[in-house]
Amino acid sequence: MKHSVNRPPTPDEDDVADGFEKDKVTLREIINVKLVESGEKENLMELVRDRLVECGWKDEMRIACREHVKKKGRKDVTVDELIRVITPKGRASVPDSVKAELLNRIQNFIVSAAL
């Protein structure tokens, strides 16, 4: 910010761009609102949960959590730390078939909702 005695501060270009971005509604936000309003988001969440259980992903994450706790010691691990350590592994290990099915369902929703 550039300051002056006689006038309010002039925002830098970065500040103007940040303000503009905050006011702009993204396509992702619009789709999310439509998914929630229609109840489809809950259906998609249930689909993902079911598919992850079917493929054994949930069991893998449970094992990874237990191994981390065993390695660090039960009293020395916090939930926040466990989430921080396991989340990247979990996201990376979601099967491509689950991602593809979810993407397909979202695309079909967008087409049917005519967004």
Curated annotation (Swiss-Prot):
One of its GO terms (biological process) is transcription elongation by RNA polymerase II. Expressed in roots, cotyledons, leaves and upper part of sepals. It is found in: Nucleus, Nucleoplasm. GO terms for cellular component: DUBm complex; nuclear pore; nucleoplasm; SAGA complex; transcription export complex 2. GO terms for molecular function: transcription coactivator activity. It comes from the Eukaryota. Keywords: Activator, Chromatin regulator, mRNA transport, Nucleus, Protein transport, Transcription, Transcription regulation, Translocation, Transport, Ubl conjugation pathway. Belongs to the ENY2 family. Component of a deubiquitination module (DUB module) formed by ENY2, SGF11, and UBP22 in Arabidopsis. Interacts directly with SGF11, but not with UBP22. Interacts with MOS4. Component of a deubiquitination module (DUB module) that specifically deubiquinates monoubiquinated histone H2B (H2Bub). Does not seem to be a component of the TREX-2 complex. Seems to act independently of the SAGA multiprotein complex. The DUB module is responsible for the major H2Bub deubiquitinase activity in Arabidopsis. This is Transcription and mRNA export factor ENY2. It comes from Arabidopsis thaliana. The gene is ENY2.
